Amino acid sequence: MTDEFTAPAYGDRSLGDVLPAVAAAMGVDAGLGPTSIELPEGRRYVVFLVDGLGYELLRDHPEEAPFLHSLLGAQAPATVGVPSTTATSLTSLGTALPPGTHGVVGYTSRIPGSDRLLNALLWDAGVDAREWQSHPTAFGRMAAAGVHTTVVNKRAFATSGLTVAGQRGAEFVGADRVGERLAAALEASTGSPSLTYLYDGDLDWTGHAYGVASMQWEQQLSMIDMAAEHLRETLPSDVRVVVVADHGMVDSPFDQRVDVDEVPDLQDGVALVGGEARFRHLYCRSGAVDDVVASWRSVLGTRAEVLSRDEALALGWFGEVSPVVRPRYGDVVVACRGDFAVQSLSAFPHEAKLLGLHGSLTSAEMLVPILVA
């Protein structure tokens, strides 16, 4: 693993190992495989995923999140996969598979055989989510093993491609407000055995908009902390609650960024730019991979790790990569260090408005808490 980067712990202590650990704690054989994550025995579990709640961010904010911070010591952090981004992480959680197997390889990635990108959050390219991610989900496997599985999320996500890719097989319950979410969790947990998944995206949104060093982010963290404590108080004591996250976040000042559109050497040989600002997929013109690697390394220097696809695969960044998934990855991938970012504002104009970013392999982005309440 390159300097300053955190290796993903696939099959050991990664986000994709959480549901296998839950199944083991329930005593349910869902065929999800072993994991080193150990959770307390229980027949009813609620998994609460807080988007953007990195381990280091929580560690550094004990006053803003006293309840969640008090739970930090019981479990070592887990890693997410690469890239450290929501679409990839949620699918790893939901399938118990690494990105190279489940195939949701980033925020945006090329649809093989085309010059188009799939936005995995919006699922906007007419791609069948069941074909793009064809493996059974962990939710579905647990349901088949007799566990009442429920996903509680905003109503708008009920039939989204990302929900279908990573969470099909569970009953979906729409809940747009915190109170609805709590009520849904309580109702879903009445059966035994049961697994209920809750999602909250407000902390991530706030971090993108204002940065993780902002008062707004700290206030939102406090609200999440109160919501988690209320969830624990509302549920019966024999219902286990596990709080996890899909990635951390770093603030990237706008003067610490490079725009591909403004540097001709970064455009030569590149047919399509995908990924996101902290982790880019570069899809190259025929025969241009070596030249693109050399040019990007020359321009970016130590600010980013620039690797060919084969080099990144050899490092194990994506876990086991299936032949059908392989061409979805960039011919070249670019992982940023420190607070650096690579924008492409012609293709991704919204990046000019995002102060907090994630996607790379720094510990601030890769490490997430496993909190048992």
Annotated model-derived regions:
Residues 1-373:
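Feature captures the catalytic ectodomains and active-site-proximal regions of enzymes
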